[in-house]
Amino acid sequence: MKIKSVYAYLHKLPITKPYTIAYKTITETRIVFLEIMLENGLTGIGSANPFSAVVGETPEQTLANLQSGFLDEFIGKDIRLFNSLIHSAATHFPKQPGTLAAIDIAFHDLFCKYLEIPVLDFYGRQKDNLPTSVTIGIKEIKEMQQDADDYYKLGFRILKIKTGIDADADIERVIKLSEKFSKKMLIRVDANQGYTITDLQKFIESTSHLGLELIEQPMKVGQEHFLSVLPEKDKKLLVADESLIDAKSAWKLSNKPQPFGTYNIKLMKSGGIAGAREIAVIAKNAGIDLFWGCNDESIVSITAALHAAYSCSNTKYLDLDGSFDLAKDLVEGGFELKDGYLYPNCLPGLGFQKL
């Protein structure tokens, strides 16, 4: 079955709960969508929302790339050439992971619809369900406690707390939040590159009694060597996010001494499912766990990340809450959220429907 048309467009979607991280405040998200249609009308949808501060690509650049004329080369091609089509896109857009993610996700959705199987089962299901964390931005303590209480009432049992502006204030916030919620919720921390090695050592020592599950990207990219002074038990707590972009960086970080015990894979960094699974293989061979994260994203790419995550045996953590705070989306379905756990709906492709 041959490809008939491709169509890319951008939507600005408001966030219901604006939030602050170590280097910016977020009030809306700009998401690029890509539709690829076969001659029989079957359509695959991809989406992308890359963070320029992390990968050097904006959604506007993603849209321009998708509308540049390259995708017209796919028209008339057989969808059964699925892998070679994705490889062709990866060769053409080697430094534009947002662009590649939109293409990769759309082709995965379309090809598996054509096969009439879920993407997850195309690769081989390794997991059925896992709990996701929900994120609380940098706020006053009372606001954070209220957010945590609201999330608990909604059935979530894992919090991810944004930190990284002031280590002393972060310690106070995390301790007070833990005092109230540690018996009923796990707590993860994301410093978004905000700490020095001294800050990090102080934070770890001051919160060691709290049983924090993870500490994500504590220091700036390029400063990973400073982490070598930490004992192994502390490095096992650390998650590589901005330091981990693609298979090349995964390979570099997997060399001993390993600065991180876990890799945060985001499709907006890896360039989609194919690139994410390359990272997963490297991590598995190095004995490193997987943590699947996201930006503020459509159900389209969140579902794609979920299918990729559940196809990898070393997946241990999910932080796929990126569509929860969108005021609206362009699709529905994809997965079910129940008591904080994510369940793919197992329809063909990625299982969502356009609204």
What function would you assign to each model-found segment?
Residues 1-40, 45-53, 326-331:
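Structured beta-strand/loop patches that form or line metal/cofactor-binding pockets in enzymes
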Residues 3, 34, 41, 103, ...:
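Conserved, mostly hydrophobic/aromatic
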Residues 4-15, 31, 277, 295-355:
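Flexible C-terminal active-site loop/helix
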Residues 5-7, 37-114:
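Metal- or metallocofactor-binding catalytic centers and their adjacent structured scaffolds
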Residues 113-137, 173, 182, 258:
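N-terminal small/glycine-rich loop or linker at the start of catalytic domains
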Residues 129-143, 192, 196:
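Active-site mouth loops of central-metabolism enzymes
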Residues 136-146, 150, 167, 171:
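Active-site beta->alpha loop and helix N-cap motifs at the rims of alpha/beta catalytic domains
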Residues 161, 168-303, 328-330:
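Catalytic core of soluble alpha/beta enzymes
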